[in-house]
């Protein structure tokens, strides 16, 4: 009987410890990524520019996971409203492009690319591409170029690639393809980078 009791006590402590480890608090206030995202959405639009920067900084610090959670909240237009989520995603994509925030940018782009791969709604996919147009770097260009043949995303992807700094190599590889549409070929040819 004593052995069973000791075993139960040990199991209780082990479960308690495991629960605390897996909760993985994100910040000094012990908030999880899900909580940070929910808090940010509840506070937007922000009252001041300072509040806005604080909220966007917290969202950007959640990295790919937080961006993915936000992007997964996008719904087809016929099923609901996306304004708050789009506002938050646009804010984060813009926030990480400012000087001094470069370390946050790769994770945000990773989250946007992963969300793009999961998203099934064309309008929401185009929105995610537009956010990548804001914050993607040459490191993301090849992953984005994979969508050039998508009938709905081909043009937005091409516009994004043209906008991404140092994406010339990706654009040149596209220019060499024989299966581009005439409009795509013209856009690549007349791009200042190609």
Name each model-derived stretch.
Residues 36-41, 69-74, 111-116, 143-145, ...:
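Buried hydrophobic core positions in alpha-solenoid tandem helical repeats
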Residues 63-82:
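Short, charge-rich amphipathic alpha-helical segments embedded
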């Amino acid at each position: 009987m004593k052995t069973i009791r000791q075993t139960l006590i040990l199991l209780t402590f082990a479960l308690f410890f495991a629960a605390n480890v897996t909760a993985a608090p994100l910040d000094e206030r012990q908030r999880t990524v899900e909580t940070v995202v929910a808090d940010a959405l509840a506070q937007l639009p922000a009252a001041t520019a300072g509040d806005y920067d604080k909220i966007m900084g917290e969202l950007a610090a959640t990295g790919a996971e937080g961006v993915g959670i936000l992007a997964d909240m996008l719904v087809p237009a016929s099923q609901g409203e996306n304004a708050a989520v789009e506002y938050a995603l646009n804010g984060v994509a813009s926030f990480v492009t400012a000087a001094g925030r470069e370390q946050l940018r790769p994770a945000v782009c990773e989250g946007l690319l992963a969300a793009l791969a999961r998203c099934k709604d064309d309008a929401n996919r185009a929105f995610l591409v537009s956010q990548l147009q804001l914050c993607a770097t040459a490191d993301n260009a090849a992953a984005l170029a994979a969508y050039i043949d998508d009938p709905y995303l081909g043009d937005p992807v091409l516009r994004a690639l043209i906008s991404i700094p140092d994406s010339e190599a990706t654009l040149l590889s596209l220019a060499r393809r024989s299966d581009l549409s005439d409009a795509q070929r013209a856009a690549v040819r007349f791009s200042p980078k190609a």
